[in-house]
Each structure stands twice: as C-alpha cells, then as structure tokens.
A protein has these predicted regions:
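A contiguous pocket-lining binding segment that forms or flanks enzyme active sites
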Residues: 147-198
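Glycine-rich phosphate-binding loop signature in dinucleotide/nucleotide-binding domains
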Residues: 140-146
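N-terminal export signals
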Residues: 7-27
Length: 245
C-alpha cells in the first residue's frame, strides 16, 4: 500500500473510531440506509395510465419560445408535440392548453398545434407556473383526473414547475420530455434531475400514449399510431402487410 493510501485509510478509520463507530459498522450503517431508501422508492406500486385517469396539459408551445430551443430541432419538436396532441385526442383525453404573455412576449401557439386541436381553448396567463393561474388550475382539476401529463417549453420551468406542483397536491405527474424543449444542456440535465427528485415521472410522448392505448386491438389503435407518425412503426406495418399477402 502506498504511503498516501495508508494515511487516508488510517484517517478514515480514526475518524470513525472518534465518532464511536467502527469503520466496518459505519459502512454497514450507510449501506443499510441506502437500501432502506431504495426499497421505499420501489414500494410505490405501478398504476398504469388509462383513458379514464389521465389528462394532457400543453404549456407554452409558442413561436417565440420555440426559436430558442436547442435540445431538439424545430421540426422534430413540432412533430412530437403535434403527435402527442393528436394521440391524446384519439384516446379521448381531456386536454388543457395554455400560453404565457402571448401578446407581449412570446407570441402565439405554433400553428400546427392549433390546427391539431380545433375548438380547444388556449388560456393565456401571466404567471410563470401554469398551476398558479386560477383558470388553468380550475381547468385541470375540473377533469377529475389524478394522472397529469405535462409537456412544455421550457422543460425545466414551464413543464417542471406545474408538474412538481401537482406532485405536491397528491397527484401523479408525468412529463413527456421529447414534447418539451429547453435552451441549453445544463438546463435540460438540471431540470430532469430536479423533477426526478420531486417525484415526477419522466417519459417520452409515444410511450405514454401507447401505455394508455394498452391493447392494439382497440378501435382507436390505428388513429393513435397514425397520430404519432412514427417512421419505424410505418415500416413495421408495411412489412407486416407485405408478409400477409
């Protein structure tokens, strides 16, 4: 053993002894603590999303904010958000749409999303956290659903803040990460970490919608997959049709 390693080892042992805990006991206690915390997290039972218990909240998918997104191209993000909205509509989920400072700062919702949701009102607000706006909060709570799927720009603010608020209210919050966007890698990584720490469930938009679909024999299946417009799914369908001939 090198001199430095010996001294470090001796120092750790001495520190543990001074605290009245043998080195091995201290390590064992720490591992036990970690195990208990991991087990407590694992005890949360899986309760799937369904058409009856979920709602979709789309936040601040506005032209001005879209231009600053750096973790997805504009085309890819639009594709994902519109696919999420159309699939949710096919699955008959309640959908809440909101913008912030539409006329003074960030502009309107991007046109493709508006076209995908004809007749769905868009609530414009001034609050940063959408859940702080009484009209948005009322629209969400009026659905009677306890599982809330959020997507927004930016990920770490517009999606994260209301999702974490929902968790604080005893609701289950999900964030469709690839239907959200942000302005730097740091914002993305810290935002994801903060949401995980708060108990928000992170996923991608297609997985969330397929979870709700549950059974490919459902009449809505074709509309859901068509809405998500996944190139690989189209390829699989084409191959299946070819082999079926």
């Amino acid at each position: 053993m090198e001199r430095r390693q010996f001294l470090q080892s001796a120092g750790l042992g001495a520190a543990a002894t001074m605290l009245g805990v043998a080195p091995l006991t201290a390590a064992t206690t720490h591992l036990s603590f970690l195990k208990e915390n991991v087990m407590s997290e694992q005890l949360r039972p899986y309760e799937p999303l369904t058409s009856e218990n979920a709602t979709l909240i789309l936040i601040d998918h506005q032209v001005g904010l879209m231009t600053g997104v750096r973790d997805y191209s504009t085309g890819e993000l639009k594709h994902n958000v519109v696919g999420l909205a159309k699939a949710a509509k096919a699955l008959k989920l309640p959908i809440v749409v909101t913008t912030t400072a539409r006329d003074s700062m960030w502009g309107p919702t991007f046109p493709e999303l508006v076209e995908a949701l004809p007749g769905v009102p868009i609530i414009d607000r001034s609050s940063v956290n959408a859940f702080d706006d009484p009209r948005v909060a009322q629209a969400i709570m009026a659905t009677g659903r306890k599982k809330l799927i959020f997507a927004g720009i930016s990920l770490e603010v517009c999606a994260a803040f209301p999702a974490m608020t929902a968790v604080g209210k005893g609701l289950d919050a999900y964030v469709a990460v690839d239907a959200s966007g942000t302005f730097s890698e740091t914002k993305r990584q810290t935002g994801l970490l903060r949401m995980q720490q708060a108990g928000v469930i992170l996923s991608d938009y297609a997985t969330l919608m397929v979870e709700i679909l549950k059974d490919n024999a459902r009449p809505e299946a074709g509309a859901v997959y068509g809405a998500m417009d996944m190139p690989w799914a189209k390829l699989v369908g084409q191959i299946a049709q070819a082999y079926g001939k």
